[in-house]
Amino acid sequence: MSASGLPFDDFRELIRNLPGPDLGAERAVREREVTLTKPAGSLGRLEEIVAWLATWTGKRTPQVNRPLVAVFAGNHGVTAKNITPFPPSVTAQMVENFAAGGAAINQICIANDLGLKVFDLALEHPTGDITEEAAMDERTCAATMAFGMEAIAGGTDLLCIGEMGIGNTTIAAAIALALFGGTAEDWVGPGTGSTGELMQRKLAAVRQAVALHQPHLQDPLEVLRCLGGREIAAMAGAILAARMEKIPVIVDGFVASAAAAVLYAANPEAIDHCMFGHVSAEPGHRKLLAKMGKEPLLDLGMRLGEGTGAALAANIVKAAALCHSGMATFEQAGVSASK
């Protein structure tokens, strides 16, 4: 813990002093790219992806051998405001479904040969109702970020971040409103199917929460503490840990992007090692990506969460790395290069 003894101080210091890009590795990849048996630039974003991998792994021939999907699950006190068609018990039930191999993310991980870890975060103890109190105290929030940092402990070279938590699109909308302004209508969407009166209550909850905590919302970590959730704090911690260990990150949908947005608001360079796997059909997600200047890899109309969009994007990243490392050069293949 820092000398001041405040739990967030260590994270503030970490966010200020993150390791930077390896420009030498990036340059080496770009130099090799022009020698490969294809017209320059013809693989489009795949060429940018492999340069990104090199930049943040420090490897001049980047490979993806141990991709991991980390799914964080949390419950939220704000669900007491009747904002969602599903009860909070569904969060734990879905964690059991993940363990049994019965969820969409399980099938995508099988299809793409990805590892999967699921972290349930005190599901029996929901965070505080953000319309009435802070979601967490500073110690709990910092401890949960630290827990999220352990997601990479088993080893990975590409981390896909996802989540599960009934009510957490409400939380993500509140975070986005606090960080980037606008109105609740700009950020609130249907989530798991909130329409009609449910949607009106969801909008009201976001407005009330941001108004209640307004005095604390100038500090992004305080936004996380007051308005966030355990799974969002853990995802923020995992993103930071990955940066320290030179592990590129693929971020999933709206809720996972809200975790990244907290770090972005604290230091825009803090998520340079992150790629955003897809843009969700949840309306606020496209706006959130635009605020952070990020272009998603996929747009499939998905809005499930669970890391599904990130996991699908991981296969594209794997393919980009294999194209770069496995393709022959013009000289090796005896193919004439362009004049």
Curated annotation (Swiss-Prot):
SUPFAM superfamilies for this protein: Nicotinate mononucleotide:5,6-dimethylbenzimidazole phosphoribosyltransferase (CobT)
Catalytic activity reported: 5,6-dimethylbenzimidazole + nicotinate beta-D-ribonucleotide = alpha-ribazole 5'-phosphate + nicotinate + H(+)
UniProt keyword annotation of Transferase present: yes
Keywords from the UniProt entry: Cobalamin biosynthesis, Glycosyltransferase, Transferase
Coiled-coil residue windows: none
Database matches in InterPro entries: Nict_dMeBzImd_PRibTrfase, Nict_dMeBzImd_PRibTrfase_bact, Nict_dMeBzImd_PRibTrfase_N, Nict_dMeBzImd_PRibTrfase_sf
Gene Ontology BP term (one): cobalamin biosynthetic process
Active site: 306
Cysteine disulfide links: none
A Pfam match: DBI_PRT
Pathway(s) per entry: Nucleoside biosynthesis; alpha-ribazole biosynthesis; alpha-ribazole from 5,6-dimethylbenzimidazole: step 1/2
MF terms in GO: nicotinate-nucleotide-dimethylbenzimidazole phosphoribosyltransferase activity
Enzyme Commission code: 2.4.2.21
Function field: Catalyzes the synthesis of alpha-ribazole-5'-phosphate from nicotinate mononucleotide (NAMN) and 5,6-dimethylbenzimidazole (DMB).
HAMAP family noted in UniProt: CobT (MF_00230)
UniProt-listed NCBIfam families: cobT_DBIPRT, PRK00105.1
Similarity comment text for this entry: Belongs to the CobT family.
Protein name, per record: Nicotinate-nucleotide--dimethylbenzimidazole phosphoribosyltransferase
Organism of origin: Brucella canis (strain ATCC 23365 / NCTC 10854 / RM-666)
Species lineage: Bacteria, Pseudomonadati, Pseudomonadota, Alphaproteobacteria, Hyphomicrobiales
